[in-house]
Amino acid sequence: MIVFPAVDILGGRCVQLVQGKRETATSYGDPLLCAESWINQGAEALHIVNLDGAFGSSKLNAEKITDVIIRTGVKTQLGGGIRSLDDARSWLDCGVDRIIISTFAADDPECLTILSEEYGSDRIMAGVDARAGEMVTHGWERPAGDFLEWADLFIRKGAGSLLYTNVSVEGLCNGIDPKPIRDLLSTVSVPVVVAGGITSPSDIKILKEADAAGVVLGSALYSGKITLQEALEAAG
């Protein structure tokens, strides 16, 4: 299982949000320094989110993100504001190993087919953001139906992996809700990385036993509720 420390970037700074709300941002400084710190502690991959992109400014932070990709040299997956084929291609061409497409994939699932044919399905990850079993899109504001049906559609259209985020617990550091994760993992055949609420080594062990391919650690890691070493040991 891969542990992905999150490097969420807003206004050129590394931040963490609560429940995805911009006004809750806590700044942790320069994104590259944060990324290098996690790598020095043993991280072999990073989960980068362009929050300005998610909030509507897809080109902001491009220089910062490219700098992290080039100077760290580790595996990266990137999401946030990828809402066109041009957006997707530009990130893939700049060296991101895997892009995460959520709202764009829900609005136009054929984008997954096009991109997987051009770049390979292993570089295309679909984001499944869910609340109470229902997919939510457009900044987690619009309910869109059963999340398992969306996961199946995304895979059929070409996604080589999924990022599952339980938005009900994201950023709260209160632990995971294992049931929907197990439901998803038992029905799909592609790797699934899990985000949202992961706070303790026991959370990670539960996900490992359920056969999750990876976990994203954000608020719990930055607040010190779990150390990267503890996470890596639980995942190992």
Curated annotation (Swiss-Prot):
Its EC number is 5.3.1.16. Gene3D superfamilies: Aldolase class I (3.20.20.70). GO terms for biological process: L-histidine biosynthetic process; L-tryptophan biosynthetic process. One of its GO terms (cellular component) is cytoplasm. Pathway: Amino-acid biosynthesis; L-histidine biosynthesis; L-histidine from 5-phospho-alpha-D-ribose 1-diphosphate: step 4/9. Belongs to the HisA/HisF family. The active site is at residues 8, 129. It catalyses: 1-(5-phospho-beta-D-ribosyl)-5-[(5-phospho-beta-D-ribosylamino)methylideneamino]imidazole-4-carboxamide = 5-[(5-phospho-1-deoxy-D-ribulos-1-ylimino)methylamino]-1-(5-phospho-beta-D-ribosyl)imidazole-4-carboxamide. Keywords: Amino-acid biosynthesis, Cytoplasm, Histidine biosynthesis, Isomerase. This is 1-(5-phosphoribosyl)-5-[(5-phosphoribosylamino)methylideneamino] imidazole-4-carboxamide isomerase. The keyword RNA-binding does not apply. InterPro entries: Aldolase_TIM (IPR013785), His_biosynth (IPR006062), Isoase_HisA-like (IPR044524), Isoase_HisA-like_bact (IPR023016), RibuloseP-bd_barrel (IPR011060). It is found in: Cytoplasm. GO terms for molecular function: 1-(5-phosphoribosyl)-5-[(5-phosphoribosylamino)methylideneamino]imidazole-4-carboxamide isomerase activity. It is an enzyme of class 5 (isomerase).
